Amino acid sequence: MRIFHSINDFQIASGGNAKKTILTLGTFDGVHFGHKKILEKVTQNTENEKYESLVLTFFPHPRMVLQVDSDIKMLNTIDEKIALLNQIGIQNLVIHPFDESFSRLTAEEFVKNILVDKFHIHKIIIGHDHRFGRNRTANIDDLKAFGEQYDFEVEEISAQEIKEVSVSSTKIRHALNEGNMALANEYLGYNYSLTGIVSKGRQLGRTIGFPTANLKIEENFKLIPKNGVYIVKSVIGSKTVFGMMNIGFNPTVNGKSQT
């Protein structure tokens, strides 16, 4: 998968022959069950070598920029999202720095200047509730109208449901905040994970025969599940071990910071 860190950096690796793209766009936080339906459609449509698949996503999350008081937490770090998209088979990933200037693009400016002129769009595959353009005023019907105007196809994907409940990043965040890992993992389609660096603690566990490791999560926007005790599978280098994880403040040993 080729990774570009802005729209202006993007170019098709096609030996000088500009291929058209079949693309989708969004924040794709979690790359969950619903997202995968769209992403897999994109890859299926590019089995014909005339086209290349492309995902446009953004960092930081638009809500972090447009709602400065938002305390939204992310399901994925950038590295996690890249790995998940790569597993699906996406050929081109554009991670564009979202800022206020970008947010002021009108719907038509976005379509004409970016989708058509930069990405050479052949087809866009998008969720039914997608909104875009300044103040998110344009919807799927507007996108279809632009498709007719600029000669590209639009495929609309309906909401994906599990047990008659539509899957969304918001519902997964809620499940994690409630400590409902089973539901969160079902909606994600994989086990939620935390990645960090082991930091030295007070080493009290080893004195009673239960050595522990304190995990420092470096990305402060990563969602930490509800305080509690969880069964975990840990990957340390090439070694995988099972264990217990406590998220909380360790009041029995006067712990003052969350670990």
Predicted regions and their residues:
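Classical nucleotidyltransferase
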Residues: 104-211
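Phosphate/ribose-recognition catalytic cores of enzymes acting on nucleotide-derived substrates
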Residues: 201-259
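N-terminal catalytic cores of NTP/NDP-binding nucleotidyl/phosphoryl-transfer enzymes
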Residues: 12-77
